Amino acid sequence: IAVGLSSKVLPHNFNELCDAAVHYLKGEPFTIYPDFPTGGAIDVGKYNDGQRGGVLKVRAKIDKLDNKTLVITEIPFSKTTGSLIDSITKAVEKGKIKARKIEDVTSANVEILVHLAPGTSSDKTMDALYAFSDCEINISPNCCVIEDNKPCFLTVSDVLRHSVDRTMGLLRKELMLRKGELEEQLFFSSLERIFIEERIYKERKFEQSKSQDEVVAFIASKLEPFKDKLFTAVVDGKGKVEYAFHREITREDILKLLEIKMQRILKYNKDKADDLLLKIEAELSEIENDLAHMTDVTINWFEYLKTKYGKAHPRRTEIRNFDTIEVTKVVEANQKLYINRQEGFVGTGLKKDELVCNCSDLDDIIVFYKDGKFKVTKVADKIFVGKNILHVQVF
């Protein structure tokens, strides 16, 4: 619809979603956080439950292989090994990270080796990778959905609640569908029982009927007395159930009775028929109980899903608080600062003038004047700071 209405809902952990669904159904509070198949780590301090305006910090997993090598084994969500290596390479080319070589030895699992330049601190380089490459990225979720034909912004918890309510509705529909099937089965089994036990098929009028319409009318008349009657099914003197027709008898029902073959009629067993009716009625009672306790049914459903599939979906992304990295402390001094005292200029581009010190393009510099005043400014290629300079250094 529009750029601001694009939806970005991040993946979450299967087990945690099942647990959250159960908590919601029980009326308990719950919190869910993203979980990525690529692993890594996340800082959820500003996630804001996935709502628009929130920010999720995502980091790669970097370990020390030895004093001269760092290894990246998990990458941020939405990044590939290729795009991650490209971002590191660009940072190296700009002098922000000191690395001798970047090697991709990924096979079944991610493995990117960062070989450090001689004399480089591995801890400082690790922080620099987070600060200047895609080893750390920010993802801005935007849970925009269509509700009542209008776009609206929800939290992921809201989406979960809607989803759980919909699941309950689907489970109810499944139970109602099965109930209808069983009622039809019970209905026709009862018709069949009457048709055979009352020997309607042996009646003279049945045998002498000249048309199908006459047969149908005759059978309908014989079934009429049973319409409002309670039937009883008993097996071995133990199980007992009473039931009645749940709907009117139609022409199609009678035509279906006429399709019963004589061999089946001859093999008809009343005890087996009663046993079937008892089983149907027992399942119907169970369904009625489930329909009256849909919350418990839905809880059992999510617990079943977790038990069956949960082991295959462990959490892969670690949740923790990230330390703030000050980029000026981890960036390499990749520039040289010069000063032209006579004209009052300082900068990295004044290569013919007086060398002050090494610096990075992210540093601030402080300039002291002979009258006791001072000035702080950013490193630039060439910037006028004024004459009567006493001293200049990185701030």
Residue ranges and their predicted role:
Residues I1-F395:
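C-terminal interaction appendages of subunits in large macromolecular complexes
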